[in-house]
């Protein structure tokens, strides 16, 4: 698989990964995804307003000399959520390190043993497969089955 994907593909993968990743406090100490997802969602809500205010404030005070700087600041503010989604998209397509791949396989096996339907085990899993597996584990396994890992 080609690891170099386009920007639009990375942004789309980041959006899917953001929706797939389980937002559980048990995972926040292990993975940075929860912090990145919260910051990206906050940026999606807040940064367009900050961008508009930075430009409109200069226009309201007739400070047209500062308008180019305000536009640059607005573009930077608008780029912050895109940077978060790009990072998430890139992360979702990154292969798991060996220790996490072993953990993914054990968790996958535990879900299959419990009788839940799950996609086939990947030989070279990526973070997006881990997200799907973790999501399924938190939904279908009881706390006693998850005690070993959390």
From Swiss-Prot:
The keyword Manganese does not apply. This is UPF0208 membrane protein VV2132. The keyword Iron-sulfur does not apply. It is a multi-pass membrane protein. GO terms for cellular component: plasma membrane. InterPro entries: UPF0208. It comes from Vibrio vulnificus (strain YJ016). Belongs to the UPF0208 family. It comes from the Bacteria. Pfam families: DUF412. It is found in: Cell inner membrane. Keywords: Cell inner membrane, Cell membrane, Membrane, Transmembrane, Transmembrane helix. NCBIfam families: PRK01816.1. Its main location: membrane. The chain crosses the membrane at residues 42-62, 70-90.
């Amino acid at each position: 698989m080609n690891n170099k994907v386009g920007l639009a593909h990375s942004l789309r993968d980041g959006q899917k990964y953001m929706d797939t990743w389980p937002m559980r406090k048990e995972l926040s100490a292990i993975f940075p995804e929860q912090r990145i997802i919260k910051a990206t969602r906050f940026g999606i809500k807040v940064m367009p307003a900050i961008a508009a205010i930075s430009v409109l404030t200069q226009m309201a005070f007739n400070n047209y000399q500062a308008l180019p700087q305000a536009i640059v600041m607005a573009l930077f503010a608008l780029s912050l959520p895109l940077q978060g989604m790009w990072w998430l998209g890139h992360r979702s397509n990154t292969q798991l390190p060996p220790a996490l791949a072993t953990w993914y396989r054990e968790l996958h096996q535990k879900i299959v043993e419990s009788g839940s339907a799950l996609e086939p085990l990947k030989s070279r899993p990526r973070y997006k497969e881990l997200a799907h597996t973790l999501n399924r584990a938190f939904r279908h396994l009881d706390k006693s089955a998850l005690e070993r890992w959390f």
